[in-house]
A protein has these predicted regions:
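Short, small-residue-biased leader/transition segments that mark boundaries at the very start
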Residues: 1-3
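Active-site microenvironments that recognize anionic phosphate/pyrophosphate groups
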Residues: 5-34
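Short, basic/aromatic beta-hairpin or loop at an interaction surface
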Residues: 42-57
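Short alpha-helix capping/helix-loop boundary micro-motifs
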Residues: 59-66
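Glycine- and charge-enriched low-complexity intrinsically disordered segments
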Residues: 101-119
Length: 119
């Protein structure tokens, strides 16, 4: 069973678009998830622009991968390091703590996540 930052059952992040390292709608993780895709974030135009600038274009559709592209308001499981970087750049999106995995805390302090809590 997964658990969230709050020590409760990990809630689903999004199924439309389908997110998560395992594409199961959940920001859970495992040994094969080197990027730690554990932060359930609500996309903003500012974050999407920063991510594209940093080389990870999440907004452009990639039909060959079945990826429609993200838009503001979509929920997506972000890499913990990218979230922390966005925080440092002043462009971090809001997060759903109940859908964010506890492994995130190995990279991002809870106090920082709480600054962006949407739930």
């Amino acid at each position: 069973m997964c658990s969230s930052d709050l020590g409760t059952k990990l809630e689903q992040c999004s199924t439309a678009p389908l997110t998560g390292f395992f594409r199961n709608g959940c920001c859970d993780t495992g040994p094969q998830d080197q990027g730690l895709h554990t932060v359930c974030a609500l996309m903003t135009a500012e974050f999407l622009a920063l991510s594209k600038y940093l080389g990870n274009d999440l907004s452009t559709p990639r039909p060959e991968y079945g990826f429609a592209g993200l838009k503001p308001g979509d929920k997506w499981c972000l890499c913990a390091t990218r979230f922390l970087q966005a925080h440092e750049e002043g462009a971090a999106p809001n997060v759903r703590l109940n859908a964010t995995h506890t492994k995130t805390l190995s990279v991002v302090p809870l106090e920082i996540l709480q600054l962006y809590a949407a739930d």
